C-alpha cells in the first residue's frame, strides 16, 4: 500500500487555526465538553479536509497525524472518534440523577436508613449487589455491622471512582467493603490499616502488651464505635488492638478461601510494610506467633469438620477436637449472613452448661440450597425433620418465659456442671471505652475446661467488655437462637430471604404453631406483617370464625402414631408425621407442611416488584422472574430451541420422540401435549354441552345436544392458575402455551 502526504494549503492552515482552542494539556477542544479525537483517513476531497480540521485536536497537526492519508482505489472516508472522559461524564450524569431521585430502581436499607441507586451501577461495582439483583431483589438490606456512612461512601465510590478514607475510618470502610465484596477497596484499606499498625508498633513493644485486644487469646470483644475515637487516639496501643480485632473478624466472615487473608496481611506487614529490622536469629513477637496459631487452628477446624454444607436430613451432633479438650457442638443450618456471628445473646450465670449450636459457613449461593433446608416463605429456619417430642402451646408471655426459664436440654446440662471446675467469667465495666450503642455485634465464646469435656457457654451482651483474659483454649462460634421456646417454626429469622412487597417493604409471612396429637382444636397464630428491622415478631390469635372461607379450621400437623410406629417397628418405609386434616396429605418435614398450608389459606406473601404478581412460595417467584429477564437457559439439543423452564424443554422433547401419550376419550385422537388434549376436549365440550376438563364438579351441563349455560362455568388452565369464563378466551390462552413449546 502506497502512502503520500498532501501539503496543507494556507487556506486550510488558517481555517484550522481559527477553529482551534488550546487546553492546558495541549489538546484542543471546547471547554467543559469531552475531548474529541478525530483521525481522518483516506480523504481525497479538499472540502472534507476543512470539516476535519475544524474538529481535530492540536496534536493532529504534528507528526503523522498532520496530514490526510489516501490510498489507491479507496474513496470512503473513516473517522475514529475517541471521547477521553466520556465514561466519567456518564457516571457524573448518573450520580446527578441519583441525587435528584431520577430513575433509581433499587433501595438499599441499613440501620433503618434508605439509600436509592441504580441497579446497573450497583451490579457493576459490587458482586454482593449483583448476586442479589440477579435473584430479582429491588429492596436489599445490608447487615447492620457497619455504619450508614461507610455504605454511603462506597456507593458514592461506585459513581465517582473516588474514595477519601481517613485513618480513623479505614476499618469501617474495610468492613463495609468486605461485605459488598469490593476487592479494590479491600486491598487499599488493608494497606492503610497496615500502615497504621506500623506507626504505632513501637508503642506496643514499649508498653509490654503482647496480646492485641479482640483476639481469641485476649477474650475481648472486637466491637468499636465512633465514641471510642478520642480514647483510641490518646492510647496508640489500643488502636492496634482495635485494628487486629476487626481484621480477625473480617477473616472469619470472608469464606474458607480467604480466612487468613487479613491476619496474613498483618503478619506480612510486620516484616515488610512496617519497615522493621528483621533478624533471622530473632523470634517473632508473641502476638505474631499467636496470629499464626489461631489462623492455623481455625483452618484445621474448618477442614476437618465433616459436615460443612447443607444436608436434607437433621445432622447429628459431632465432636470437634481442640488443643486441650472436646466441645460438644450440635450443628444446625446456616444463616446466609455470616458476619461476625451477629446474634441476640444474654449473659448466663456462673457454671451453667448448655448445648450450643453452630452455623456452618456458607459454601454455596442461595440457589444451591436444598429445598428441605430453607423456609421459602421469606424466613430461613433451622428445623429438623424429626417430630418434636413435646409441643407447647404458644402463649402471650412465651417470649419472656423463654428468656427466664431454661429448656429441658439446658436443665439437663446444668447438673454435671455444678460440680465441675471453676472457669473465668465475663465482667462488665460501666466506664469501659469499648461500650458501643451504634453497632450491634455480639459473639459467643465457648470456653473449654482443662479437666473436663464439658463446655461452658459464655454469652456477652452488646454493651460489655472483658475484665480479665479468658483461657487460650477458646473457639469463637455463633449461636442460633430461637425467638421463642414454644414456637417451633421458624427458629431463625434472616434478612436474606426477604419477602418482596409493594412500596419497597419487606414482610414476614404467617407462621403456624404445632400442637400435640389429641390436644383438640386450637386457634391459629399468625404474624403481623412488619418490616425486618431487628424487632421481634408480633403474633395475633385468629379465632375459628375468622376463617370464613373454609368450613373446617386449619389445624396443626397431627402426628401419625399408627403409621409412624409401624414404620419404626418394621424399619421400612418413610415416616411422615405431619398430616393435613383438610386434604389428608402427609409430609415428612414440618416446613413442607407449612408450605402446603399456603394452598388452603390462599396466602401469597411473595410479590414481584415488576408486575406485582404474588406467589405463595419463593421458588415460584424466582421462576417467574425469568419471564422478565428473558433468560432462556434450557436449549433443545436437536433443534436448538431455547426455553425458560426445564419442564417446557421436557414437554418439547416429546415432539422429537414422536410420543403421543394423551388420548381424547371422545374421538380417540392422540396428542403429544396435555394442553393440546385439553384444548381439543374443550372444543368437544363447546359443541355438545359437555363441561370441559377444567370445569368444577358442581357446574354440569344440561341434556346432550344443548349448549350448557356459561354462567358459573369456569375453564381452568392446567399449566398456569388462569381461569376463564368464556371458551374463546380459554382457547386463545391455550394456544399461547402451545406456541411457547
UniProtKB/Swiss-Prot annotation:
Segments of skewed composition (Basic and acidic residues): 1-17
Protein name, per record: Zinc finger and BTB domain-containing protein 20
Purpose of the protein: May be a transcription factor that may be involved in hematopoiesis, oncogenesis, and immune responses. Plays a role in postnatal myogenesis, may be involved in the regulation of satellite cells self-renewal.
UniProt cross-references to InterPro entries, sorted A to Z: BTB/POZ_dom, SKP1/BTB/POZ_sf, Znf_C2H2_sf, Znf_C2H2_type, ZnFinger_BTB_dom_contain
Modified-residue entries (Phosphoserine), positions: 353
Phosphothreonine: modified positions: 211, 357, 690, 695
Localization per Swiss-Prot or TrEMBL: Nucleus
Primary gene name: ZBTB20
Amino acid at each position: 500500500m502506497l502512502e503520500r502526504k498532501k501539503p496543507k494549503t494556507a487556506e486550510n492552515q488558517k481555517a484550522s487555526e481559527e477553529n482551534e482552542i488550546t487546553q492546558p494539556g495541549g489538546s484542543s477542544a471546547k471547554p467543559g465538553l469531552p475531548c474529541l479525537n478525530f483521525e481522518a483517513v483516506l480523504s481525497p476531497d479538499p472540502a472534507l479536509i476543512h470539516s476535519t480540521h475544524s474538529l481535530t485536536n492540536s496534536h493532529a497537526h504534528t507528526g503523522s497525524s498532520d496530514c490526510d492519508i489516501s490510498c489507491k482505489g479507496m474513496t470512503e472516508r473513516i473517522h475514529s472518534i475517541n471521547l477521553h472522559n466520556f465514561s466519567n461524564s456518564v457516571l457524573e450524569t448518573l450520580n446527578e440523577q441519583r441525587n435528584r431521585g431520577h430513575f433509581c430502581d433499587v433501595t438499599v436499607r441499613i440501620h433503618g436508613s434508605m439509600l436509592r441507586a441504580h441497579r446497573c451501577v450497583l451490579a457493576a461495582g459490587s458482586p454482593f449487589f449483583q448476586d442479589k439483583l440477579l435473584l430479582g431483589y429491588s429492596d436489599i438490606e445490608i447487615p447492620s455491622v457497619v455504619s450508614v456512612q461507610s455504605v454511603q461512601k462506597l456507593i458514592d465510590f461506585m459513581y465517582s471512582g473516588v474514595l477519601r478514607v481517613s485513618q480513623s475510618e479505614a476499618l469501617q470502610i474495610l468492613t463495609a467493603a468486605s461485605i459488598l465484596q469490593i476487592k479494590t477497596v479491600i486491598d487499599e484499606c488493608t494497606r492503610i490499616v497496615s500502615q497504621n499498625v506500623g506507626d504505632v508498633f513501637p508503642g506496643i513493644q514499649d508498653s509490654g502488651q503482647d496480646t492485641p485486644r479482640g483476639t481469641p487469646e485476649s477474650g475481648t470483644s472486637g466491637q468499636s464505635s465512633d465514641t471510642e475515637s478520642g480514647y483510641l487516639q490518646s492510647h496508640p496501643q489500643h488502636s492496634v488492638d482495635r485494628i487486629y480485632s476487626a481484621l480477625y473478624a473480617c477473616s472469619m466472615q470472608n469464606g474458607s478461601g480467604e480466612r487468613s487473608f487479613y491476619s496474613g496481611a498483618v503478619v506480612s506487614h510486620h516484616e515488610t510494610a512496617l519497615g522493621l529490622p528483621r533478624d533471622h536469629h530473632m523470634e517473632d513477637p508473641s502476638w505474631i506467633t499467636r496470629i499464626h496459631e489461631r489462623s492455623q487452628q481455625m483452618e484445621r477446624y474448618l477442614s476437618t469438620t465433616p459436615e460443612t454444607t447443607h444436608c436434607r436430613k437433621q445432622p447429628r451432633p459431632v465432636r470437634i477436637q481442640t488443643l486441650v479438650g472436646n466441645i460438644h457442638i450440635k450443628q444446625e443450618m446456616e444463616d446466609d449472613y455470616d458476619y461476625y456471628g451477629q446474634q441476640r445473646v444474654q449473659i448466663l450465670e456462673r457454671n451453667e452448661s448448655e448445648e450450643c449450636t453452630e452455623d456452618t459457613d456458607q459454601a454455596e449461593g442461595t440457589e444451591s440450597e436444598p429445598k428441605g433446608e430453607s423456609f421459602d416463605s421469606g424466613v430461613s429456619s433451622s428445623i429438623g425433620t424429626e417430630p418434636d417430642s413435646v409441643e407447647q402451646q404458644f402463649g402471650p408471655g412465651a417470649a419472656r418465659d423463654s428468656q427466664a426459664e431454661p429448656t429441658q436440654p439446658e436443665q439437663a446440662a446444668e447438673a454435671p456442671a455444678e460440680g465441675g471446675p471453676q472457669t473465668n467469667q465475663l465482667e462488665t465495666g460501666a466506664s469501659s471505652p469499648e461500650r458501643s450503642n451504634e453497632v450491634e455485634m455480639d459473639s459467643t465464646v465457648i470456653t473449654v475446661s482443662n479437666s473436663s469435656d464439658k463446655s461452658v457457654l459464655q454469652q456477652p451482651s452488646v454493651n460489655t467488655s472483658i475484665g480479665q483474659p479468658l483461657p487460650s483454649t477458646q473457639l469463637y462460634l455463633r449461636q442460633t437462637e430461637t425467638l421463642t421456646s414454644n414456637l417451633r417454626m421458624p427458629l431463625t429469622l434472616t434478612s436474606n430471604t426477604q419477602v418482596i412487597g409493594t412500596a419497597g417493604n419487606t414482610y414476614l409471612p404467617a407462621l403456624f404453631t404445632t400442637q400435640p396429637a389429641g390436644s383438640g382444636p386450637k386457634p391459629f397464630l399468625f404474624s403481623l406483617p412488619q418490616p425486618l428491622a431487628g424487632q421481634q415478631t408480633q403474633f395475633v390469635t385468629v379465632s375459628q370464625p375468622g376463617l370464613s372461607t373454609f368450613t373446617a379450621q386449619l389445624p396443626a400437623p397431627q402426628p401419625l402414631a399408627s403409621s409412624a410406629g409401624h414404620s419404626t417397628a418394621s424399619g421400612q418405609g418413610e415416616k411422615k408425621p405431619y398430616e393435613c386434616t383438610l386434604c389428608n396429605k402427609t409430609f415428612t418435614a414440618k416446613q413442607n407442611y407449612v408450605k402446603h398450608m399456603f394452598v388452603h389459606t390462599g396466602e401469597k406473601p411473595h410479590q414481584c416488584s415488576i408486575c406485582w404478581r404474588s406467589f405463595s412460595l419463593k421458588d415460584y417467584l424466582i421462576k417467574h422472574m425469568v419471564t422478565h429477564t428473558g433468560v432462556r437457559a434450557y436449549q433443545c439439543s436437536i433443534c436448538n430451541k431455547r426455553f425458560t423452564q426445564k419442564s417446557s424443554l421436557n414437554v418439547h422433547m416429546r415432539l422429537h420422540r414422536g410420543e403421543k401419550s394423551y388420548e381424547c376419550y371422545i374421538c380417540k385422537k392422540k396428542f403429544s401435549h396435555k394442553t393440546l388434549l385439553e384444548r381439543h376436549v374443550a372444543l368437544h365440550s363447546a359443541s355438545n354441552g359437555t363441561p370441559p376438563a377444567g370445569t368444577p364438579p358442581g357446574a354440569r351441563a344440561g341434556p346432550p345436544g344443548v349448549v350448557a349455560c356459561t354462567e358459573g362455568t369456569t375453564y381452568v388452565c392446567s399449566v398456569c392458575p388462569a381461569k376463564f369464563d368464556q371458551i374463546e378466551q380459554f382457547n386463545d390462552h391455550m394456544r399461547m402455551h402451545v406456541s411457547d413449546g
